């Protein structure tokens, strides 16, 4: 054993020492190999590392001739395949025997071998590509391969192995088909294989098709497998019928024709085949749940002469006893379902056929005529028809309470009040209700109706006013293109129904300076358009709604906290008025009155420790030294009476967290403080790479390069004069701003042109002179650039602010985030031995860095596990805070600068417009520009209000999270959002891994329920061992001796059926040893092989063949009691079998005329 292991108390071990061997199974059909080397060497495995990372070392140690990428580890002798993606500790639940060996001081053995999927693919490739003797040997070995590795069976089924067997068997002769049926029988003996056959309908169809084979051995084996399949579960009978009908529709033959041909004995007489066939039919009929399915099967058989076949075999003197029993059973089941007999022979009890009543017939006809579903009509019991009171009483309350229970709600919130009246009027009053309650309800209806009419009228009037005031603004402001296209001085373009000009004029006249603080520095050049209106409109920028930002958020709560904190410093204890709930006195200078719906956040968070952060016991017990969490503890002091905040019902987030109990003993063990390894210090990053800059580029080349992407010079001049944005794009305007001619360049070009008037100017010089000829060029370009940039600049500012506002709401309302904080706080309080009320969220960056000292798993991994245990319905957190994750990519300090730049550019655009007024400017163009700049000024002012209120809300949000005002001032929005984003991303990744691990464990538990389990261990076949026949047909290997009694025979039979044929995983044998190592047992029943069968078809049977024969024998020998007709569902009460309809449903004279009367030779 390596150091660090603990065998005494079963605690996790970090390093385990095992013995390792390899098994050369690259060729899955090579059955003569043994694990090598015979003396297994020892190897130390790290229990905390994934096994996939440790397999190369094991591979090198053993020198295994296997491909490294195809290797897997198998535990010996249990045969469990380890998951290479997980560590040993993560698979501890599935390795109880493995760790039990370690606890006893032993060294378990691991086998390095080929993965199951690789071996199965090799088997399928060999079967598909082989032919002749090689295919014959492969099919012969397939059964033994399934016997030796029980984990290979489900992998073979899941890898389309059944389809491979069917495809190979369809193109092979009967000898190959016999080998395939032997392998398929071995598969079906396992529960996993049987479930795979149940889910693969093609296998059942192929088995039914083989019933028509010319080889008796193939037919007999196929019938055996079908018998076991139908007997395994009652749900398999409909699957078998569906397969029969599918084959019949494909081949064009009648259903059940293959079984009827066996009963007709076209290929010779074989009593065993007849017994199996009739038993299969009886077992299928006995498992059918409804009468229609029963009659569909029997009618198809009767149409092919089943009655004549039954009578012929019953009339023969030498008919086998088992065959006679099954035939009589078929006849009695048919007669019992038709109601011709009242008691099943041998059933031991009387069973009356359910007679269809007249009420049931009427009800069925009514449902057929009315198009109703017959399944909803109550079926009568065995004693008589159902009472009609049930439907009447059940539909009565539904009709009364239906409209009231599911009203159709109106889309608008105002019209939702009308919903009250159907609830009042439709709700039925009780029989004992008085007349006074009726009058009271009517009075309430009248009052509510009057109030609703009043509100609807007011709403309609308000809606008309709003619709007339803002016809082109849907809850926000039009974009720059709409403002540009709708100038104020173009009244002819407006419709006479739109009073928007008057509303805008009144709004502009009502502009007044903000009483709190000016938005821009006071200057004599400031225009009135920068002043805010007294009654500000709804805060919305484009499609972003900021209307929930109230005027109370114009004041920064950090300033309020500072003033109130200063007042509280001299006092040794919180003042009594604050404890009684009275709000604190206003600070100096007095701020504007708070008008918002929520009170401001408290000046200082509550000081009382939270109950959920205290450990379970009142006094902390003495414990071992644990790893400490170096978080910054929140000092929640003060006893303010404010009990609610804008973000929740409590003053702080920590006060609203639910208590979380953690396993302190497990945490104490996992995070026990140990010698810390010296981690190498991180190397300092290299210095910044010096940037190479190119100075003094040639002006001419730069202009010529720019001209390649610009329109011709004359087009540029016309576009600049008319502000034609279709001729010059936004990129073109930016290039023109960099290519504007300077005064010095213009003078040099003019002097050169005067000196040489005959020589034309070059392209660059001509371009600069053309631009210089445009009056107010710089003003035009700046105004035009502002017009094109405004929408994008406004959205770049508004969208992050909106995301921040929504992100705070998402985080506060997120239940997963609260659970994470509560769990982490409880864990940290235990590890630190403290009673902290909370911690700064900046510690979330370090949660993934803390690791336990046992398994070296991060604290985040344990946190995910605890959260999933506490709240399995919790989310991954990352997908629920998308707004904050987007905010993590935005520099809000730069956003503030961009907002200031937008204001400055807006003022500069106004100055440019004033300077352009000196030049020639069309009146319509000037009106459009003036209208556009006025609207931009209003929107910039509104954007400034939104920015201020969102930032103040973020400060209040930090106070709600427990930050002090001093700490909140140091928090940057981008850094805060980045911390939450990175933590949420790591939490999602770790949570997915934990869920994947839990899913693998659950899959293992489900897989272990059927892993290697035989169908003889299921409830259906559990009585087979107790029904061992005490006749001379008992196998020789089962009987202990000629003088033994029934008790010994029963014990040996039970041990044979319940024992697995090959329980050892790695005890591989050569093919020459198969016959000698397996008990040779004769087949049950007649074993005389037909002369046309080849010598290789009579194969020696082993234990699995004997088990299959005993299962079939138990099915055929079952008593009539188990096959008594069951009470089936009836969709039509008067349906009879085809035989009874043809004979009993006609008149006596017509029956005699058709020659259908019963003769003496047809009596059963």
Swiss-Prot record:
<dbReference type="InterPro" id="IPR042201">
    <property type="entry name" value="FH2_Formin_sf"/>
</dbReference>
<dbReference type="InterPro" id="IPR041387">
    <property type="entry name" value="FHOD1_GBD_N"/>
</dbReference>
<dbReference type="GO" id="GO:0045944">
    <property type="term" value="P:positive regulation of transcription by RNA polymerase II"/>
</dbReference>
<dbReference type="InterPro" id="IPR011989">
    <property type="entry name" value="ARM-like"/>
</dbReference>
<feature type="modified residue" description="Phosphoserine">
    <location>
        <position position="573"/>
    </location>
</feature>
<dbReference type="GO" id="GO:0030866">
    <property type="term" value="P:cortical actin cytoskeleton organization"/>
</dbReference>
<dbReference type="GO" id="GO:0051015">
    <property type="term" value="F:actin filament binding"/>
</dbReference>
<feature type="compositionally biased region" description="Low complexity">
    <location>
        <begin position="1028"/>
        <end position="1041"/>
    </location>
</feature>
<dbReference type="GO" id="GO:0051496">
    <property type="term" value="P:positive regulation of stress fiber assembly"/>
</dbReference>
<dbReference type="Pfam" id="PF02181">
    <property type="entry name" value="FH2"/>
</dbReference>
<dbReference type="GO" id="GO:0051492">
    <property type="term" value="P:regulation of stress fiber assembly"/>
</dbReference>
<feature type="compositionally biased region" description="Low complexity">
    <location>
        <begin position="402"/>
        <end position="411"/>
    </location>
</feature>
<feature type="domain" description="GBD/FH3">
    <location>
        <begin position="53"/>
        <end position="458"/>
    </location>
</feature>
<feature type="compositionally biased region" description="Basic and acidic residues">
    <location>
        <begin position="355"/>
        <end position="368"/>
    </location>
</feature>
<feature type="modified residue" description="Phosphoserine">
    <location>
        <position position="498"/>
    </location>
</feature>
<feature type="region of interest" description="Disordered">
    <location>
        <begin position="1020"/>
        <end position="1143"/>
    </location>
</feature>
<feature type="region of interest" description="Disordered">
    <location>
        <begin position="340"/>
        <end position="411"/>
    </location>
</feature>
<feature type="coiled-coil region">
    <location>
        <begin position="884"/>
        <end position="921"/>
    </location>
</feature>
<dbReference type="InterPro" id="IPR014768">
    <property type="entry name" value="GBD/FH3_dom"/>
</dbReference>
<feature type="domain" description="FH2">
    <location>
        <begin position="616"/>
        <end position="1013"/>
    </location>
</feature>
<protein>
    <recommendedName>
        <fullName>FH1/FH2 domain-containing protein 1</fullName>
    </recommendedName>
</protein>
<feature type="domain" description="FH1">
    <location>
        <begin position="487"/>
        <end position="615"/>
    </location>
</feature>
<comment type="subunit">
    <text>Self-associates via the FH2 domain. Binds to F-actin via its N-terminus. Binds to the cytoplasmic domain of CD21 via its C-terminus. Interacts with ROCK1 in a Src-dependent manner.</text>
</comment>
<dbReference type="GO" id="GO:0016020">
    <property type="term" value="C:membrane"/>
</dbReference>
<keyword id="KW-0206">Cytoskeleton</keyword>
<dbReference type="GO" id="GO:0005829">
    <property type="term" value="C:cytosol"/>
</dbReference>
<feature type="modified residue" description="Phosphoserine">
    <location>
        <position position="523"/>
    </location>
</feature>
<dbReference type="GO" id="GO:0005737">
    <property type="term" value="C:cytoplasm"/>
</dbReference>
<comment type="function">
    <text>Required for the assembly of F-actin structures, such as stress fibers. Depends on the Rho-ROCK cascade for its activity. Contributes to the coordination of microtubules with actin fibers and plays a role in cell elongation. Acts synergistically with ROCK1 to promote SRC-dependent non-apoptotic plasma membrane blebbing.</text>
</comment>
<feature type="compositionally biased region" description="Pro residues">
    <location>
        <begin position="571"/>
        <end position="608"/>
    </location>
</feature>
<dbReference type="GO" id="GO:0005856">
    <property type="term" value="C:cytoskeleton"/>
</dbReference>
<feature type="compositionally biased region" description="Basic residues">
    <location>
        <begin position="1127"/>
        <end position="1142"/>
    </location>
</feature>
<dbReference type="InterPro" id="IPR056771">
    <property type="entry name" value="FH3_FHOD1-3-like"/>
</dbReference>
<dbReference type="GO" id="GO:0032059">
    <property type="term" value="C:bleb"/>
</dbReference>
<feature type="modified residue" description="Phosphothreonine">
    <location>
        <position position="495"/>
    </location>
</feature>
<feature type="modified residue" description="Phosphoserine">
    <location>
        <position position="367"/>
    </location>
</feature>
<comment type="similarity">
    <text>Belongs to the formin homology family.</text>
</comment>
<feature type="domain" description="DAD">
    <location>
        <begin position="1053"/>
        <end position="1133"/>
    </location>
</feature>
<dbReference type="GO" id="GO:0005634">
    <property type="term" value="C:nucleus"/>
</dbReference>
<keyword id="KW-0966">Cell projection</keyword>
<dbReference type="Pfam" id="PF24959">
    <property type="entry name" value="FH3_FHOD1-3"/>
</dbReference>
<feature type="modified residue" description="Phosphothreonine">
    <location>
        <position position="690"/>
    </location>
</feature>
